[in-house]
Amino acid sequence: MGIQAAEISAILKEQIKNFGQQAEVAEVGRVLSVGDGIARVHGLDNVQAGEMVEFPGGIRGMALNLEVDNVGVVIFGDDRSIKEGDTVKRTKSIVDVPAGDALLGRVVDGLGNPIDGKGPIAATERRVADVKAPGIIPRKGVHEPMATGLKSVDAMIPIGRGQRELIIGDRQTGKTAIALDTILNQKSYNEAAGDDESKKLYCIYVAIGQKRSTVAQLVKKLEETGAIDYTLVVAATASDPAPMQFLAPYAATAMAEYFRDNGRHALIIYDDLSKQAVAYRQMSLLLRRPPGREAYPGDVFYLHSRLLERSAKLNKDHGAGSLTALPIIETQGGDVSAFIPTNVISITDGQIFLETELFYQGIRPAVNTGLSVSRVGSSAQTDAMKSVAGPVKLELAQYREMAAFAQFGSDLDAATQQLLNRGARLTELMKQPQYAPLTNAEIVCVIFAGTKGYLDKVPVKDVGRWEQGLLKHLRTNAKDLLADITNNDRKVKGELEDKIRAALDTYAKDFA
């Protein structure tokens, strides 16, 4: 058989015609130097600030410093495998993370990659990590309560949906415990809500620079109580590079905004922002940005303000969703006038101030009710709570003032003695064990008992036992009363007050 040149050339032409049409054009640069989680890259002329870039081996980084002859890139991963001369590719996309209901019940890193060994996450969408906060027009005043289940907080420092309430205190004063109790407290509310998404609250917990053992312990507690079903944990632990610790809060907020923007409610806990500021300081100094006060860069206020401004209550036209934030700040030796604490205090809508001294006295949660405030105030309380909680703060403030005086004088008049007795019992009543959040109705009944003199004859050491007995009594013999307070929110007076008094009188007779 003869070789036909024309046929061969036709076949070759056909094959050449379709060859290499999907040629990929990539803008690349070269690594000039690398170390401490920072790479200097030459040649990425058109890169954007905040753009994701890719190193060999799939390691990602973010362009932060755009200089005349090179780009400063922070690396999200191990920089030991990157060497001088490596090629760096632009991805042409700003740092984004997965979002959606599929993330609930999972533990992810700062980029949204699962780290709990439960397989990949089927996220429905991706969201840019660092977006602008909602403007003034889409917002609405905070008016729905966000119950923590803690008597001292819900009665005296109420938090509303869409509020930013700072938890501030020294190390080991129970800051994380308050945040964790708040997550656990949502379980009963979420179960009672059924399919009504407008009542449910989803929780996002961000661990920044913490020990892995601490995060594992927290996840275990959430799994044991079943709270993990409505919670997402984002972990950038102490062993993660500084850029990951810096990014994690923004990434987690983007995941939480998915709920806010779909007319649902979310709570985000940043534990803690002091460590994020330290990570950002490290990055900034390595990028040779000029240092300011306490060696933090000049834009460290903006670092936190742009993050916390994303928590908001949206109005009806924008879905009526909300994002509530509980940022945590660790102080050194009770110094709230340091740089980062004063910054975050000025950004947030109030603070829960925890004191080491109270903690060691056994007053836990160790909330200093005099220094703690909620700038949203009683608009974030139910009517029933508002009517019973009013006198508590005043009585405790008067008690603290008198207690300081009473140390000097021995002959006190009857009114002062009565004030001191009542104050001691109210202080005892505000104590609460960890992992034992109470419902709104239970807190109303307990505080009503405290302010209306039911405890005045009970010895101070028995107040805790008295309260536990009362709660047991209410849960077994007065279920209708608790349901009534929960479902028909109104001031505690008239018929409702009589019902509560009747339940308390019945219990007081039996208590011994």
Swiss-Prot record:
One example GO MF annotation: proton-transporting ATP synthase activity, rotational mechanism
Catalytic activity: ATP + H2O + 4 H(+)(in) = ADP + phosphate + 5 H(+)(out)
EC numbers: 7.1.2.2
Pfam family membership, one: ATP-synt_ab
Positions contributing to ATP binding: G169, D170, R171, Q172, T173, G174, K175, T176
Gene3D superfamilies the UniProt entry points to: 2.40.30.20, ATP synthase alpha/beta chain, C-terminal domain, P-loop containing nucleotide triphosphate hydrolases
Cellular component aspect of the GO annotation: plasma membrane; proton-transporting ATP synthase complex
Enzyme class, broadest EC rank: translocase
Domain of life, source organism: Bacteria
Protein name: ATP synthase subunit alpha
Lineage: Bacteria, Pseudomonadati, Pseudomonadota, Alphaproteobacteria, Rhodobacterales
Underlying gene: atpA
